[in-house]
Amino acid sequence: MRKFIRAYFCFSFIVCFLYSSEVVAHTVPPALRELDFSIAINKKSIALGDRWDNDVAHKIKVPTEGQFVGEIPFDGVNYKFYQHHQAELDVFSSNLLWDKNERNVNDYIVSQITINSGECSTPRGIHVGSTIEELNKAYGVGQSENDSGEQWVSYELGIKLLSFKIKDNMVVKISMNYAN
């Protein structure tokens, strides 16, 4: 009888362990990757860090020349930023980190992507209008921050930052940029 009870408890423990491992495997989203800093628009994709040129501007149907927003300091160096706007999104190009990445001062990259409407989504399917539950399921629980009354949930990979503005438990804006 003792052997039966011991075997029963061992079997029960193993089954519970395997079940809990299976549940964890299904509920923990994959770690953030470089691909998470891209969007698909008009069946074309652009990503943070892509070289800014006529082809990229054409993909998202904005002029190559943007509106100058100013020089913004990163690590004590000022970099030039330009905004390229359309209804669904804002893309910022800059010569960010040209000096550290062995590029010419006039070589520009996509340095920020801001999604303003539900037309665009992240590679994990999150878009403006997604719920906080969908966000947590896709990315996990991120770093929550209240900035001047606005709630943001953020995820970092190296110097890249993926942020979601939340209002009434819904995603209302998505931003991908370089952390400063």
Give, region by region, the residue ranges found by the protein language model.
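Bacterial N-terminal signal peptides that target proteins for export
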Residues: 1-9
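Gram-negative bacterial Sec-dependent N-terminal signal peptides
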Residues: 8-17
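Second-shell loop/turn segments in exported
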Residues: 41-46, 118-126
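A cross-family detector of function-defining hotspots
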Residues: 52-105, 124-170, 176-179
